[in-house]
Amino acid sequence: MSTPLDHIRNFSIVAHIDHGKSTLADRLIQLTGGLDTREMKDQVLDSMDIERERGITIKAQTVRLSYKAKNGEDYVLNLIDTPGHVDFAYEVSRSLAACEGSLLVVDASQGVEAQTLANVYQAIDNNHEIVVVLNKIDLPAAEPERVKQQIEEVIGIDASDAVEISAKTGLGIEDVLEAIVNKLPAPKEGDRNAPLKAMLVDSWYDSYLGVIVLVRVIDGVLKKGQTIRMMGTGAKYPVERTGVFTPKMVQVDDLGPGELGFITASIKEVADTRVGDTITEDRRPTENMLSGFKPAQPVVFCGLFPVDAADFEDLRGAMGKLRLNDASFSFEMETSAALGFGFRCGFLGLLHLEIIQERLEREFNLDLITTAPSVVYRLNMTDGTHKELHNPADMPDVVKIASIEEPWIKATIMTPDDYLGAIMKLCQERRGIQIDLTYVGPRAMITYDLPLNEVVFDFYDRLKSISKGYASFDYNLSDYREGDLVKMSILVNEEPVDALSMLVHRSAAEKRGRALCEKLKELIPQHMFKIPIQAAIGGRIVARETISALRKDVTAKCYGGDVTRKRKLLEKQKEGKKRMRQFGKVEIPQEAFIQALKMGDD
């Protein structure tokens, strides 16, 4: 039996990293009896090892909570736990579209952070009702009154009746549940007898059940035995089971309007289940599709290569499996003269890249080399055509290019004002253009336009070290702008190394080239002949370092003072070295690649 609409609440929790939303979710599950004490562990919803170690949420998860409110009525609360990190904003947007309300969790000691803002604005765009929750009230540094005022000033929502809680100790959790019931709206229209219309919120792969699809039913009823059709892809499947997460999987007979649950339908490929698609019944389809989500656009690209070429097939299989779970990760094959066969992969951001790499190494035991991350450039050719450039090594001849456009981002940085000067200097070094600066109490909020190219290397690390970890950073893509960009190639022994080529701004090319050459000089071992390492832009060498040759003392066995004999031996050695240099191949160790690619503008 489905729950009546006015007793359902679909909500998500919006917060900055570390403000305690996964802990709050744990307490809500515990209080409503979703899991018994034995099954309870910290961060129940963060199911991946990486999520728990890093203390971040990557995949959005859902739970159905049953709650008997103080007014004696029974309510069904569907919680969608969302990631807070900027790279996973795509997951956030999907979760928010399936709900009607949000809990905004703010740390009472830290106040509003950059990512809180980004996610709250997304919730407001989705016309969500917002309940403010102040967490960590038990900390000595908590300043609830100051933070309430800050929320009103920065976000512009009324925080006077914010719920004050401590998710760690369980203080005030009941008040949160009451606020959800009383302040958040029930799902809008929904007709049980209308043709089935449901939104596909997420999908992931389970080795036993195939693809599990998370759905939010809007009209009609979804039950076992129906044949459903994905309106976007046209694929049809018979429904095998319907159920909900409590957070364990519990099968139910049917899912009615306003409800969130899962279905399995022997779907083999997650690619067939596009997030944001409309699910309807094949026999009696709905007239109009839902406006789907925007598909995630990869922002950062890099090459992933196996250290051992024999692992290539394993890597291909592993990537296919990750692609099953992560719709925003894309890859295609590529070959590199230096690194052999591998893949060119697209990611939503640097954290996404790190996590995919770590999951490949961890879950599939692969050793990988990552090439320098690059962004997508637009090339305007002289013949009037336009091209997208994902890999700097594929850049066409400069003569054919009229101009190059690069992606720019709008970055919001929140920082204590002590570090403001250093952060502004960092942004200016990275070609940033200041848009806005406002003060909220002792914290400053700066808005900058920055080229993404300058951010992908190590901007985030530098920002954190300059501000002793206090600054928070959030960005979204704004537009493409023309830039004076040049391709920098690295030549080792006069041979270009494709894996190290990159697009840089002309003004920074020399500095970047010199730093890279110096780094490679330390990393490449000496050979029997002299090795020049050069950074070149077009035909012009902008930096050079030389690794001196290992030298065998050929004159050691000469006694006596005959200088001509010595000279003859030295000349002969010189000839040999010259020939060796002509035909000799320089072995660049894998460590050298890894270290050189890690190098930022130190």
UniProtKB/Swiss-Prot annotation:
It comes from the Bacteria. It is a peripheral membrane protein. It holds the Pfam family GTP_EFTU_D2. Its EC number is 3.6.5.n1. This is Elongation factor 4. GO terms for molecular function: GTP binding; GTPase activity; guanosine tetraphosphate binding; ribosome binding; translation elongation factor activity. It comes from Brucella canis (strain ATCC 23365 / NCTC 10854 / RM-666). Keywords: Cell inner membrane, Cell membrane, GTP-binding, Hydrolase, Membrane, Nucleotide-binding, Protein biosynthesis. PANTHER family: TRANSLATION FACTOR GUF1 HOMOLOG, CHLOROPLASTIC (PTHR43512:SF4), TRANSLATION FACTOR GUF1-RELATED (PTHR43512). Belongs to the TRAFAC class translation factor GTPase superfamily. Classic translation factor GTPase family. LepA subfamily. InterPro entries: EF-4 (IPR006297), EFG_III/V (IPR035647), EFG_V-like (IPR000640), EFTu-like_2 (IPR004161), G_TR_CS (IPR031157), LepA_C_sf (IPR038363), LepA_CTD (IPR013842), LepA_IV (IPR035654). It is found in: Cell inner membrane. SMART domains: EFG_C. One of its GO terms (cellular component) is plasma membrane. GTP binds at residues 18-23, 135-138.
